[in-house]
A protein has these predicted regions:
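A short hydrophobic beta-strand element within the catalytic core of glycosyltransferases
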Residues: 56-58
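C-terminal alpha-helical cap of glycosyltransferases
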Residues: 140-165
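Nucleotide-activated donor-binding/catalytic signature segment of Leloir-type glycosyltransferases, i.e.
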Residues: 8, 17-40
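Short hydrophobic beta-strand element within catalytic cores of glycosyltransferases
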Residues: 79-82, 99
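Short alpha-helical donor nucleotide-sugar binding micro-motif in glycosyltransferases
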Residues: 40, 49-53
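A short, well-ordered alpha-helix in the C-terminal region of glycosyltransferases
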Residues: 116, 123-137, 149
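A short alpha->beta transition loop at the rim of the catalytic pocket in nucleotide-sugar-dependent
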Residues: 54, 77
Length: 165
Protein backbone atom coordinates (compact mmCIF):
# COMPACT_ATOMS: atom_id res chain seq x y z
CA UNK A 1 0.00 0.00 0.00
CA UNK A 2 1.30 3.38 -0.99
CA UNK A 3 1.44 6.05 1.70
CA UNK A 4 1.96 9.76 1.15
CA UNK A 5 3.79 12.10 3.51
CA UNK A 6 3.36 15.76 2.57
CA UNK A 7 6.28 17.66 4.07
CA UNK A 8 6.39 21.41 4.56
CA UNK A 9 4.04 24.32 4.57
CA UNK A 10 2.87 26.76 1.90
CA UNK A 11 4.56 29.68 3.66
CA UNK A 12 8.21 29.14 4.59
CA UNK A 13 8.71 29.02 8.34
CA UNK A 14 5.09 29.64 9.17
CA UNK A 15 2.33 27.47 10.51
CA UNK A 16 -0.51 29.26 8.76
CA UNK A 17 -2.43 27.34 6.13
CA UNK A 18 -3.46 28.25 2.65
CA UNK A 19 -6.93 27.55 1.24
CA UNK A 20 -5.32 24.95 -1.04
CA UNK A 21 -3.74 23.11 1.90
CA UNK A 22 -7.01 23.11 3.85
CA UNK A 23 -8.80 21.63 0.84
CA UNK A 24 -6.08 19.01 0.42
CA UNK A 25 -6.30 18.01 4.08
CA UNK A 26 -10.08 17.65 3.80
CA UNK A 27 -9.71 15.40 0.77
CA UNK A 28 -7.04 13.34 2.52
CA UNK A 29 -9.31 12.61 5.50
CA UNK A 30 -11.12 10.01 3.40
CA UNK A 31 -7.86 8.08 2.99
CA UNK A 32 -7.22 7.52 6.70
CA UNK A 33 -3.59 6.94 7.63
CA UNK A 34 -2.45 6.73 4.00
CA UNK A 35 -1.83 10.51 3.85
CA UNK A 36 -0.03 12.52 6.54
CA UNK A 37 0.95 16.19 6.73
CA UNK A 38 3.99 17.39 8.68
CA UNK A 39 3.49 21.13 8.46
CA UNK A 40 6.60 23.31 8.48
CA UNK A 41 9.91 21.43 8.77
CA UNK A 42 13.23 23.29 9.31
CA UNK A 43 15.77 22.80 6.50
CA UNK A 44 18.26 21.02 8.74
CA UNK A 45 15.65 18.33 9.49
CA UNK A 46 14.78 17.64 5.86
CA UNK A 47 17.36 14.86 5.27
CA UNK A 48 15.53 12.75 7.88
CA UNK A 49 12.32 13.06 5.87
CA UNK A 50 14.02 12.37 2.54
CA UNK A 51 15.48 9.17 3.99
CA UNK A 52 12.02 8.01 5.11
CA UNK A 53 10.81 8.07 1.52
CA UNK A 54 11.02 5.49 -1.23
CA UNK A 55 10.43 8.31 -3.69
CA UNK A 56 10.40 12.12 -3.45
CA UNK A 57 7.72 13.80 -5.53
CA UNK A 58 8.11 17.50 -6.42
CA UNK A 59 4.86 18.39 -8.21
CA UNK A 60 5.30 22.11 -8.65
CA UNK A 61 2.78 23.89 -10.83
CA UNK A 62 4.84 27.10 -11.03
CA UNK A 63 8.15 27.82 -12.75
CA UNK A 64 10.58 26.32 -10.24
CA UNK A 65 13.84 28.17 -10.83
CA UNK A 66 16.31 25.98 -8.97
CA UNK A 67 14.56 22.82 -7.83
CA UNK A 68 16.68 22.49 -4.69
CA UNK A 69 14.25 20.03 -3.09
CA UNK A 70 14.95 17.64 -5.95
CA UNK A 71 18.73 18.09 -5.61
CA UNK A 72 18.55 17.58 -1.83
CA UNK A 73 16.48 14.42 -2.29
CA UNK A 74 18.99 13.04 -4.81
CA UNK A 75 21.79 13.87 -2.37
CA UNK A 76 20.01 11.66 0.17
CA UNK A 77 19.88 8.87 -2.40
CA UNK A 78 16.21 9.13 -3.25
CA UNK A 79 14.69 8.90 -6.72
CA UNK A 80 12.72 11.95 -7.81
CA UNK A 81 9.42 12.39 -9.59
CA UNK A 82 8.85 16.00 -10.64
CA UNK A 83 6.94 18.19 -13.01
CA UNK A 84 8.78 19.63 -16.01
CA UNK A 85 9.15 23.18 -14.74
CA UNK A 86 11.71 25.97 -14.85
CA UNK A 87 15.18 24.63 -14.12
CA UNK A 88 13.99 21.17 -13.09
CA UNK A 89 14.82 19.52 -16.46
CA UNK A 90 18.36 20.91 -16.17
CA UNK A 91 18.88 19.38 -12.72
CA UNK A 92 16.97 16.20 -13.52
CA UNK A 93 18.45 15.48 -16.92
CA UNK A 94 19.06 11.76 -16.76
CA UNK A 95 18.19 8.44 -15.23
CA UNK A 96 17.77 9.80 -11.69
CA UNK A 97 14.26 11.18 -12.15
CA UNK A 98 10.93 10.90 -13.90
CA UNK A 99 9.59 14.18 -15.27
CA UNK A 100 5.94 14.73 -16.14
CA UNK A 101 4.37 17.59 -18.05
CA UNK A 102 2.41 20.34 -16.30
CA UNK A 103 -0.70 19.94 -18.34
CA UNK A 104 -4.36 19.24 -17.63
CA UNK A 105 -3.54 15.66 -16.65
CA UNK A 106 -0.66 16.26 -14.24
CA UNK A 107 -2.43 14.38 -11.43
CA UNK A 108 -2.97 11.37 -13.69
CA UNK A 109 0.65 11.41 -14.84
CA UNK A 110 1.93 11.64 -11.26
CA UNK A 111 -0.36 8.81 -10.17
CA UNK A 112 0.81 6.60 -13.04
CA UNK A 113 4.50 7.33 -12.34
CA UNK A 114 4.14 6.72 -8.59
CA UNK A 115 2.48 3.34 -9.19
CA UNK A 116 5.04 2.39 -11.85
CA UNK A 117 7.95 3.22 -9.53
CA UNK A 118 6.24 1.46 -6.60
CA UNK A 119 5.98 -1.70 -8.70
CA UNK A 120 9.63 -1.53 -9.86
CA UNK A 121 11.96 -1.29 -6.83
CA UNK A 122 14.93 -2.16 -9.06
CA UNK A 123 14.28 0.97 -11.12
CA UNK A 124 14.02 3.07 -7.94
CA UNK A 125 17.38 1.68 -6.81
CA UNK A 126 19.00 2.59 -10.14
CA UNK A 127 17.49 6.08 -9.95
CA UNK A 128 18.78 6.48 -6.38
CA UNK A 129 22.34 5.64 -7.40
CA UNK A 130 22.23 7.93 -10.42
CA UNK A 131 20.67 10.73 -8.36
CA UNK A 132 23.35 10.60 -5.67
CA UNK A 133 26.02 11.03 -8.36
CA UNK A 134 24.10 13.87 -10.01
CA UNK A 135 23.63 15.69 -6.69
CA UNK A 136 27.41 15.88 -6.25
CA UNK A 137 27.52 18.28 -9.21
CA UNK A 138 25.37 20.72 -7.22
CA UNK A 139 27.04 20.57 -3.80
CA UNK A 140 28.04 23.81 -2.08
CA UNK A 141 31.68 22.67 -2.14
CA UNK A 142 31.50 22.16 -5.90
CA UNK A 143 29.90 25.60 -6.40
CA UNK A 144 32.61 27.17 -4.24
CA UNK A 145 35.41 25.43 -6.14
CA UNK A 146 33.89 26.47 -9.48
CA UNK A 147 33.50 30.07 -8.27
CA UNK A 148 37.12 30.24 -7.11
CA UNK A 149 38.29 28.74 -10.40
CA UNK A 150 36.31 31.33 -12.41
CA UNK A 151 37.65 34.21 -10.32
CA UNK A 152 41.18 32.86 -10.66
CA UNK A 153 40.81 32.38 -14.42
CA UNK A 154 39.44 35.89 -14.78
CA UNK A 155 42.05 37.60 -12.64
CA UNK A 156 44.75 34.94 -12.48
CA UNK A 157 47.54 37.42 -12.98
CA UNK A 158 46.74 38.81 -9.50
CA UNK A 159 47.37 35.54 -7.64
CA UNK A 160 49.86 32.74 -7.86
CA UNK A 161 47.25 29.98 -7.45
CA UNK A 162 43.60 29.44 -6.54
CA UNK A 163 44.67 28.35 -3.04
CA UNK A 164 45.97 31.85 -2.31
CA UNK A 165 42.46 33.30 -2.70
Amino acid sequence: RIKLLIVGSPFFGRTQQSPFLRKLEQQAETLGDRVRFTGYVPNDSMPEYYRLADLVCVPTLVEEAAGLVAVEAMGCGRPVLATRSGGMPEYLDGSQAVLVDRDGNVAGQLSFAIRMLYEHPDLRAQMSTAGAKTAQRYSSARFYDDFVRIVYDFGGHLWNSPSSV
